[in-house]
Amino acid sequence: MGSTTQMSDYLVSTTTTSSASSMVTMTSQIENNSLNSNDNTNTTNNNNNNNNNNNNNNNNNNNNNNNNNINNNNNNGGMVGVNHKTHKKTASIGGGKNRAILHDFTFSYFIPNQNRSEDNSNENELGLNNHNVQHQGPIIHLTKNLLHFYKKCNSNFNYISSLNPRRVLTHPSEPLSNDGYDNVNSDYIVYVNDIITNNESGQKYKVLDSLGQGTFGQVVKCKNCDTDELVAIKILKNKQAYFQQGRLEIQTLKSLNDQHDPEDKNHILRLLDSFIHKMHLCIVFELLSVNLFELIKQNNFRGLSTNLIKVFLIQILDALIVLANANIIHCDLKPENILLQNVNSPAIKIIDFGSACYEKSTLYTYIQSRHYRSPEVLVGTVYCASIDMWSLGCISAELFLGLPLFPGNSEYNQISRIVEMRGIFPSDLLDKGKSSTRYFHRHLGSNSDDNNNNNNNNNGKPYYYTLKSEEDYQRDSKTTLLPSKKYFNYKTLPEIIQNYGFKKSMSPQDIEKEKQHRIVFTDFINGLLQLDPNERWSPMQAKEHPFITGQPYNGPFIPDPSKKRHFTYSQPKQIPQHSMLNGNQILNQHQLFQQLQQQQQQQQQQQQQQQQQQQQQQQQQQQQQQHNQFQQQQQQQQQQQQSSSQQHIQIQPLQLFSTPYTSTNNTPNLSSSNSGSSLNNLKKLNLPPFKQQQQQQFSTSQNSDSFNFPNESFSPRGIYIPSSASNIQQQQQPININNNQNGVGSQVSQLALGQSPSLFGTPTNIYPPYSSMYNNSPVATPNSLSFYGSSWGSDSSSISLNPSTPTQKQMFQQQQYSNNNNNNNNNNNNNSNNNNGNNTNNINSNNNNNNVNRRNRSKSDIPSDSFSSSEGMDPQFNLYQQQQQQQQQQQQQQQQQQQQQQQQQQQQQQQQQQLQYQQQFQTLQDLNIEGEKPPIYPNSPHRKRSHSGYLDQYANGYNSQQTNNTQQQQQQQQQQQQQQQQQQQQQQHPSFFSTRMHLDHFNGGSRYRSQSYGDQQFQQQQYKQQQKNLHHQQQQQQRFMQVGSPPTSHLSPPIPQSPLMMSQPLHQTYIPQQQQQQQQQQQQSQPTPFTPQMISQEPISPALMGDASSIWNPSPTEELLFTIDLPNQQNTPHLTPSNSSTNLLGKSASSPLKNSSGGAIPPTPTIPINMEEINNGFSKFHFNDQPSWNSNGNSPWMIQQQQQHQQGFNGNSESMYNDDLIGFSPYNNYSNDYRPQLFNKQSPPSSYNSNKSFYGGSGGGGNNNNNNNSRPTNQNFSNSLLPSQQQNVIFPQNSPPSSYNSSNSLSKSGGNTVKNNSNTGGRPRGDSMKQRFNSTNNLLSGGSYQYQQQQQQQQQQQQQQQQQQQQQQQQQQQQQQQYKKDTPSLMMSPPMNGLKTSSEIGIPSEEIRYQYQQQQLQQQFQQQQQQQQQQQIQQQLQQQQAPPQNRKQVVIGSYRET
């Protein structure tokens, strides 16, 4: 077999070499045929025939010689060195000592001298009777008669040509799409001998070979199976853009062939057929030969003779005249698109009309191959049919030179080559060009070079253009140019053509004639390569040139102006939606694809429906058997129940696979005593151990309708089902979605795309888990099951009803009927939505079915119910609750009806919008008005994982604003409705336990927990980390003003990026560059003195905040797993408007939390604080006491100065601050401030001491009503929001540390200290909350001995703190002395986190000294106050020496231990 393959390869190689040699001689034959006139054609043919005869004679002589040699060999014994014993064949190579003998033991059964008669008989049978050749070698014998040899070896062998392995013509050949017919490039995978069929006409074409492959698709050589005619079929890619391009080509060729060239005399390609095969558009053409580029390539890229070029140009001009009369532009004329009809003749035809368009109705701006691209296309102006004449001039020069005339490797390089040879482009052309400024410079004045050039391109305008240099172009366009190669030694066209080499065989006379021809040829090309399209010759003018007509040349040719075709730019005929080609109807592209998809999908659906029907029949039979068995068992149970005087709770185990299953678990089953009611029917679920794989239908005797349960997963506890809730089933039907593409309804899964059943069931409650209406339905129906699963008897088992009384049964049946009606309505709505073909789902709908099959949180997050048990107990419920629930359900039904009406309105709007978009899209595609190619599959939906099954209607955002507005309105309406329901329900039935809440459910309905809990936890971690990074970056980047607020003030704004601020947009304003530069310079020039150490502000868990209120402000890193219950106004009498004299937050205050009366509720601090001031009124609580730095109207921060009277700390109503913008409160809205996002951030802490420890608190007290410059260091807060038993505990809220200069620079006139009437001893905050509670517990649990020890420890701690305070005061005095020595500018501390210094604010140095003096006085006063408090504490300790057993509460200092 190896020898046979070698022989076949040799034969193939010889044929290829012979064809290559014939291609080399082809050009000479074409030239000879083109030179001879019609009179000499007969003589040339005779000469060729004679030459052929001579060649045949020579071949015959050679064959005779070969035969003689074979005969001689046979006479000598056939083969040299044959050993008949061993059947060994030897052959000698060389001679003498170097002689080598080759032994061949193959085919030893062929013995040459054995039985000549047998060999002759075999030869006669094979038809090899040759008297000259008595024997053939095994290679020749087995090559020619291989099939006969196989037949001899195996009599059962039969050769079938169709079973031969087929060669693949498409690369890559790996199937990927379109049912395995397409590869990764959407090309149809073609094999040799494939049959391509026109399904409409029944015409079949057999694939023979490949002719080429490109970006459009591929061209294959085929044979018509009916007529054996060879054709070329162009198979386009399975993409919509190429389909549209092929459709244009079909229409263009049809109009040219039928109307403008019906006799096929103008060298335009003929269209034979067109159809669709396997979703690919196929166009059948006549079969042609090689193109002109291949002809030049076969000539080793040497130019052709002027005579042959003349023959080609005449035919091309004839074709262009036809195109001009038809107002058609080819747009892609090049040597590759000009093909020879036959190898032996110069007849050509123009092909590839895929880029053709009508004049003045141009489709694309990126047309023509770069080497043949006209100047108007390069610059980006309106083009016409003259661009084809420019391409013809480039083709003419390339045929003569063998290389492209302008071989640019980029558009800039192409323009530079044209400018170098033909001059600068006309100014009129550059003025209209869209890309002119990209490649040219525009200068004022007149260009001196225009006078030297033949073409004056300035036209008397006051400006001129020059080409950009390579450096300028690379700098402006930010690109890098590749190096280009110059192929010609001359720059001008006449020099290049005249200096081209001559043939060596030419005589001097022939050279002179050739020079004259070249001069005429140069003038012809010069007229085609005019830069101005208006001066460029038309095809009619070019055809009258002496080079074409052969007339004598008397100088530069001046064309006839009357033959110049003035382009009328008439509107071309639009491509009709339906056109007929050879009796075959070509439909619109949308209809074609839809029909094909419908046919395929209909076949698949029919098969699926048949299978489903068979399965349903089998299931029904099984269910009937099970139902009969079940009825028998049920009758027996009912008889037992009727005999008993009391209702017994019986266990009915779930039967797995129709076998009884028993267990020792005592799971109660509440059954009815009525035997005739369908409520006693128990559904048998044939389940695997934990999952129900398929839905099972169950039909009762009273109602034959089938009930489909959703796919669920069951826990081990959910094996038992209570009989009271067995027949309360939700009827669900498969939803038929009307697909836009195929238009055929198909069954789809009830789960959303990409979803699977959760581990503990599917959500069926219409309310979210954090809603107060959640899980309040007493009946265990599929609609009232737990939100986290419908598994019966799970940890969150729902409450079931035992309808034992007649009234309860009636109400139960009414409720069941209403539920079924609601579900049916919802199903109908869903069907209507799907039939409309919308790809979007209504996210804001509250229908049950919209949320039936969505995955939610895991079972560990289920909110526990006060009546539920861990073993699936189902206690009875009273009638009062049933009536209330019926009222709630009626309200829900009304809400659902309103929502359904809203949905219908939305659907109608969406349908109208879709129709408009489809009409616009079809008109754009049919008319091809757009400047770019149509998108591929524009209607395909783009899925977003964040929506978990919900799809946006359009990814391009056509109607995003409208949909967003409607969604926001719906969300607001739903939120208002839910709030009303919650308030009503809380008034009627206050909840025992507050439902838990997750951070994801805080921000509205756009976020879902559709994945498993582990996956979502990972996503939450990513989201949290992003929020952390944003928070950290914003703190570093923003420049804050120092505010005198506590570290986490009770009235401080919420932390940025927290759930309370997620819905508020971050406002960004423009910062002038000059002010930014000034700020940067000031920062660089400022010194860096001592900076205080910042403390961490991590929130404390609410469990440890014994005295904190129930409102809690979470940090960005903490998960909110409980609800925020806002206290009502009646529970907080101190927050009434009558008790508060002033608005604490100002006019522009805003809070994300509000109480029932609309007032703002401040967020809760994360550190325990005093609440006393809140009892006395919000007016006494003062913070962020920042004075107005610039009293004049010209403020450096462009802040409007306002005035507002506020009340002091001591309760007096004297006005001490005339500026409403105290400390730049974050709750105020400063529209004129240019600092971005300044007031959305938490202010950093500050105090007046630079090195003062945060834990060393200074006592508060005393009265000082003077306007001093000291800041309050101890701010007392009340705890009126807590119960009355815990309102006596007072905690001091000390200000955090900061440098002296920073605080002074920010305060012009300080506030007054607080008069503290309570027993506060300045207790430090160094101990944590756990230590505080541990100390209280030990105090209560231990005896008097432990109590005394604790008192001693507290005294020791107080002494240590006093010592620390004294040390800190000494350090402060030392530092203050150092700062006094320095200049006022050095006394200012650097801005901490972007704080302003005194120089920036504009505070003079005298005020700083005054502030320092006032602060020293305040320190002395505070020290005296601390000493008084310590004395009071010691007196109280002496009085409270009674044993702790006789006391319930002990007040120690500012603490109350319970």
Swiss-Prot record:
It catalyses: L-seryl-[protein] + ATP = O-phospho-L-seryl-[protein] + ADP + H(+); L-threonyl-[protein] + ATP = O-phospho-L-threonyl-[protein] + ADP + H(+); L-tyrosyl-[protein] + ATP = O-phospho-L-tyrosyl-[protein] + ADP + H(+). It is found in: Cytoplasm. Residues 588-643, 878-927, 1346-1383, 1409-1442 form a coiled coil. Residues 32-83, 441-462, 545-571, 659-714, 791-874, 930-1095, 1128-1161, 1233-1347, 1375-1399, 1435-1458 are annotated as: Disordered. Its EC number is 2.7.12.1. Residues 205-548 form the Protein kinase domain. This is Probable serine/threonine-protein kinase yakA. It comes from Dictyostelium discoideum.
